[in-house]
Amino acid sequence: MLRAIIVDDEPKAIQSLSWELSNFDKDIEIINTFTEADKAIKHINESSIDCLFLDIEMPTMDGFQLLEKLNKRDFAVVITTAYNEYAIKALKNEAIDYLLKPIDTDDLEATINRIKNHNSKNNSS
């Protein structure tokens, strides 16, 4: 079971991604969602998760700032954004992938496979 957290300032984006993930793969559990990055930090630091789906453009703190404030990064990070120009920066910040909104089902499938590969490599180390 993959345990994930979604952080996005748009509730509809959270709802849509949660729905797509649960319909795509029954082995994915969304353990929490947050619309404010600063409120997500403590929970992410205290949780045992496999993946963080993270929006970049948020009002009080952007996704890159959130990543800098995390105590640990032993999980896969997937950037979700409507802006193509964040893709390279996301990968430079050690995200394993990015998804452009609106999220394409084929892209989501490829991302889920990357998460599973990432986690199996980390678990075997």
Task: State each model region's role.
Residues M1-A4:
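Extreme N-terminal starter segment of soluble prokaryotic enzymes
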Residues P11-A13, A37, I56-T60:
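Short hydrophobic/aromatic-rich motifs at helix boundaries and adjacent loops
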Residues V7-D8, F34, L52:
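Conserved sequence signature across two-component system core domains
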Residues E10-N32:
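Two-component/phosphorelay signaling modules centered on CheY-like receiver
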Residues S18, T33-K42, G63:
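Helix N-cap/capping motif at the beta->alpha junctions
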Residues I41-E46, D50-S124:
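CheY-like receiver
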